[in-house]
A protein has these predicted regions:
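Residue-level detector of intrinsically disordered terminal segments
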Residues: 6-8
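Nucleotide-state-sensitive switch-loop elements of NTP-binding domains
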Residues: 16-26, 32-66, 74, 83-169, ...
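P-loop (Walker A) phosphate-binding loop of NTP-binding proteins
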Residues: 71
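Polybasic, lysine-rich low-complexity intrinsically disordered segments
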Residues: 1-3
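Hydrophobic positions on the alpha1 helix immediately C-terminal to the Walker A/P-loop
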Residues: 79
Length: 190
C-alpha cells in the first residue's frame, strides 16, 4: 500500500512572523502555506489555522476588499488584470484571490484564472492565489474570508476576490467585501 506523505507545516509563529514582517519572498511563501493550511480539512491543520488567524487579526482591517462576480466568460479576469495593473501603478499592493471550479477527480482548481492574468502575474509585487470552490455555493471558497485576512496581514492594501462564474443569486462575496461589482454581458437582459 502506497502512503501519501503528510504535509508538514511550519509553526504558526513562524508563519505569522514571515507574513507580517518577512522579506518579500518569505512573505509570499508563508502566505501560500497559510492559505493551504486554512484550506486543509485535517483536524490538526484546522487547529493550527485557528491559532494563526488569532495571531494575524491585529494586523488586518486596513485593506479595501473588492468582490468581482459575473457569468462565465464576461471578462472577470481581464477586468481584474487591468484594475490590478492600474492600482499597482498608483502605488497600491494588490492581492487577488481567484476562486475556480473544482475538479471532480483531484478537488483542485481546474480553470486556472491566474493564467488569464498573464501581465499581472509577472509583476513582482501582486499576490495571485487560485483556490478551488470545492463545491461551496455562492461563488467563493469555504475559506475565502480567512484567506483575505492573510493577505491583509501581509500588507496588501487592496484585496480582490474573483468568484467562480456565477449567476445573479450567488453573491456571498458581497457579504465579505467593501465593494461588490457584478460584471454583465451587453444585451443579456437584467
Amino acid at each position: 500500500k502506497k502512503t501519501v506523505p503528510r504535509m508538514v507545516m511550519p509553526s504558526t509563529q513562524t508563519l505569522r512572523d514571515d507574513i507580517v514582517g518577512g522579506s518579500a519572498m518569505a512573505k509570499r511563501r508563508a502566505m501560500a502555506k497559510a492559505i493551504t493550511l486554512l484550506e486543509s480539512t485535517r483536524a490538526d491543520h484546522r487547529l493550527q489555522a485557528d491559532e494563526l488567524l488569532t495571531h494575524l487579526l491585529p494586523h488586518t482591517g486596513l485593506s479595501l476588499r473588492l468582490g468581482i462576480s459575473g457569468v462565465p466568460g464576461v471578462g472577470k479576469s481581464t477586468f481584474i488584470e487591468a484594475l490590478g495593473l492600474y492600482l499597482i501603478g498608483q502605488g497600491h499592493r494588490v492581492a487577488v484571490l481567484a476562486v475556480d471550479p473544482s475538479s471532480t477527480v483531484s478537488g483542485g482548481s481546474i480553470l486556472g484564472d491566474k493564467t488569464r492574468m498573464e501581465h499581472l502575474s509577472v509583476q513582482a509585487d501582486p499576490y495571485i492565489r487560485p483556490s478551488p470552490s470545492s463545491g461551496t455555493l455562492g461563488g467563493v471558497a469555504e475559506k475565502t474570508r480567512e484567506s483575505m485576512l492573510v493577505c491583509e496581514a501581509a500588507g496588501y492594501d487592496v484585496v480582490i476576490v474573483e468568484t467562480v462564474g456565477v449567476g445573479q443569486s450567488e453573491t456571498a462575496v458581497a457579504n465579505m467585501t467593501d465593494m461588490f461589482c457584478l460584471l454583465q454581458l451587453p444585451n443579456a437582459g437584467d
